[in-house]
């Protein structure tokens, strides 16, 4: 019984260590994901603003050039 208890204790320590390693890895991946999402939103915002600016130019020039 003592031997089984020691074996389970060692196995439990290994599992806790592996769990901590995976938790840290998940945290790093989450941070990377958040950074990539932020960059994507910035690019989409810039693209949307650029398109809106060119659309506004087209609308104003076509409105002023009515015959």
UniProtKB/Swiss-Prot annotation:
InterPro entries: ZPR. Keywords: Coiled coil, Nucleus, Transcription, Transcription regulation. Disruption phenotype: No visible phenotype during the vegetative growth. Disrupted activities of the shoot apical meristem and/or axillary meristems after the transition to reproductive growth. Zpr3 and zpr4 double mutants exhibit homeotic transformation and ectopic meristem activity. The keyword Transcription regulation applies. Expressed in the adaxial epidermis of the cotyledons and leaves, and in the vascular cylinder of wild-type torpedo stage embryos. Confined in the central zone and the organizing center in the shoot apical meristem. It is found in: Nucleus. Residues 14-59 form a coiled coil. Residues 42-67 are annotated as: Disordered. The keyword Transcription applies. GO terms for cellular component: nucleus. GO terms for biological process: adaxial/abaxial axis specification; leaf shaping; leaf vascular tissue pattern formation; meristem maintenance; negative regulation of DNA-binding transcription factor activity; regulation of meristem growth. Induction: Up-regulated in response to increased HD-ZIPIII activity. Up-regulated by ATHB-14. Up-regulated by REV. Competitive inhibitor of the HD-ZIPIII transcription factors in shoot apical meristem (SAM) development. Acts by forming non-functional heterodimers. Part of a negative feedback loop. Involved in SAM development and lateral organ patterning. Essential for proper functioning of stem cells in the SAM. Interacts with REV. Interacts with ATBH-8, ATBH-9, ATB-14 and ATB-15. This is Protein LITTLE ZIPPER 3.
């Amino acid at each position: 019984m003592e031997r089984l208890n020691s074996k389970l204790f060692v196995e439990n320590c290994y599992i806790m260590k592996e769990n901590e390693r995976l938790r840290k890895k998940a945290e790093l991946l989450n941070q990377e994901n958040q950074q990539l999402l932020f960059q994507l939103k910035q690019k989409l915002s810039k693209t949307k603003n650029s398109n809106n600016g060119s659309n506004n130019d087209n609308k104003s020039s076509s409105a002023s050039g009515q015959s």
